Amino acid sequence: HSFPTRRSSDLTAKAIGVIIENPEFADVRSLEGVAPTKKHAVFTIAVPTTAGTAAEVTINYVITDVEKKRKFVCVDTNDIPEVAVIDPDMMASMPKGLTAATGMDALTHAIEGYTTKAAWEMTDMFHLKAIELIARHLRGAVENTAEGREGMALAQYVAGMGFSNVGLGIVHSM
């Protein structure tokens, strides 16, 4: 099967956890779109190693289908981890380029969530705070400072709290 191995390990864990409890979805491609799973994924403790996906707090994950050379989104309320451990030190070994790229992913989440038609006052608050934190901390995270990593860990988490309530735009479907 094709799993999102080029992405966050949390995304991979979410897909595997859902399939373990819902074996009828053994072909991961059957999870595309709004997945009609019946059982919650296996108990999961998410420990993000990047500051970008917010997989630890959202009902979304992206699968890369390497055979068809495309990615697709899965939306499933049964895949949210029970516990999230946000430890900026887990991101310390990321190369500068990956840190910048995942930071831009978090920024894209915040902008798309803020501009979506479903946005409202509470989600605007999350997204605007995420944008502010990213503007303040992305450069430091790329330079691997503790303050920068901590700020980006919080920023991507806050962006995830926002977009998990309103969805994203077309950028994330490309």
Per-range role (PLM):
Residues 1-8:
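Short, small-residue-biased leader/transition segments that mark boundaries at the very start
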Residues 60-166:
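Carboxylate- and glycine-rich phosphate/diphosphate-binding segment that chelates Mg2+/Mn2+
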Residues 22-49, 78:
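Short, acidic/small-residue loops that bind anionic groups at enzyme active sites
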Residues 7, 15-16, 156:
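Glycine-rich, small/polar surface segments that engage phosphate groups of diverse ligands
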Residues 10-12, 37, 41, 51-57, ...:
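Short, well-ordered, mixed-charge alpha-helical segments that flank or form enzyme active sites
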Residues 15-32, 59-69:
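A glycine- and small-aliphatic-rich helix-loop capping segment at beta-alpha/alpha-beta transitions
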Residues 166-174:
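C-terminal catalytic subdomain
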Residues 6, 45-48, 85-87, 108:
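Short beta-strand segments
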